[in-house]
Amino acid sequence: MLKKDMNIADYDPELFNAIQNETLRQEEHIELIASENYTSPRVMEAQGSQLTNKYAEGYPGKRYYGGCEYVDVVETLAIERAKELFGATYANVQPHSGSQANSAVYMALLKPGDTVLGMNLAHGGHLTHGSPVNFSGKLYNIIPYGIDESGKIDYDEMERLAVEHKPKMMIGGFSAYSGIVDWAKMREIADKIGAYLFVDMAHVAGLIAAGVYPNPVPHAHVVTSTTHKTLAGPRGGVILSAADDEDLYKKLNSAVFPGGQGGPLMHVIAGKAVAFKEALEPEFKVYQQQVVNNAKAMVEVFLERGYKIVSGGTSNHLMLVDLIGRDLTGKEADAALGSANITVNKNSVPNDPRSPFVTSGVRIGTPAITRRGFKEAESKELTGWICDILDDASNPAVIERVKGQVLALCARFPVYG
């Protein structure tokens, strides 16, 4: 018999201390990595439940194991809530990650060697959109599109490349682009050449759910997302469609299971169900609008302090600070800010002369700081501190002063109160 009072602290103090230290780090550091967020205690409760014990290969009502009557309820709740949230007629909540959701789409719609048009990683795309080091770049013929001199997606170039190469699939979505994507324009181009339009909305799914960013679901043949990031749920993936195409839905389901995965993680799917319910609440819309407001406030200060922002601003949750021409690399900026308890990530910028391991930029996002209660005033104050460090990154006195200010601000806005 397993005793209910068994705990990590008594049995495995090394692991317990690591968990406690990470909890403290999250409370005492300002999180500005655009892909990170804080999930709710309700989501964590679901993920720590006995659902982790249950194997459930297959789909609700069509399982390969017995005893699935209650996990069927859990998965059906997640599916129906995801469909309601994004206006879809199909949802698969089983992908373990956004990348696995993306790989399922490739498997369902393409054959190895097929041509795909995807956003250049150096211009803001994602590894799974055709990077040579990723399965997508190794198995498929990738044609990259990018941004123009203004930092906006170049739809003329996209259309020219589409007509020239006639890809079987076009990919929309990004990991480091601060503008609005014209999903309708992309579908128009896809229809012109008879291609599938696949959108990876992982970074902006929460904004889309709240109606503060355009929804790709009505335009794309298939859409994927992570369930964390702006959506603030557990780490995982989801596939959506409103194509009203049962054959497509069957292909997608088969590509997830048995094509790419075995048993789904039912405790994570329960966490997704909770997160989707939270995202349907009115306060979630308020939160997402504040995410965008905070990002715009940060951009305002960066520009005032003389820093270049790729695209010149932001219409979502993130911004890319371009350090080309400054005596500071993205790697150095990342480290200096980290020493002051401000967590960002180094990031390549368009036409970056430095390697992806060094870079000439940093990516900054506002989902996590907004989750802990920051508004425009705190966002602007924080950006001023960031600029102080970037202006004088080798000065330990500046870093120490900002670290003290960060700790005081974190104490005012705890993550979990």
From Swiss-Prot:
One of its GO terms (cellular component) is cytosol. It comes from the Bacteria. (6S)-5,6,7,8-tetrahydrofolate binds at residues 121, 125-127, 355-357. Its EC number is 2.1.2.1. The keyword Transferase applies. The modification N6-(pyridoxal phosphate)lysine is found at residue 229. It is an enzyme of class 2 (transferase). The record marks 228 as: Plays an important role in substrate specificity. SUPFAM superfamilies: PLP-dependent transferases. InterPro entries: PyrdxlP-dep_Trfase (IPR015424), PyrdxlP-dep_Trfase_major (IPR015421), PyrdxlP-dep_Trfase_small (IPR015422), Ser_HO-MeTrfase (IPR001085), Ser_HO-MeTrfase-like (IPR049943), Ser_HO-MeTrfase_PLP_BS (IPR019798), SHMT-like_dom (IPR039429). HAMAP family: SHMT (MF_00051). This is Serine hydroxymethyltransferase. It comes from Shewanella baltica (strain OS223). The lineage of its organism: Bacteria, Pseudomonadati, Pseudomonadota, Gammaproteobacteria, Alteromonadales. The gene is glyA.
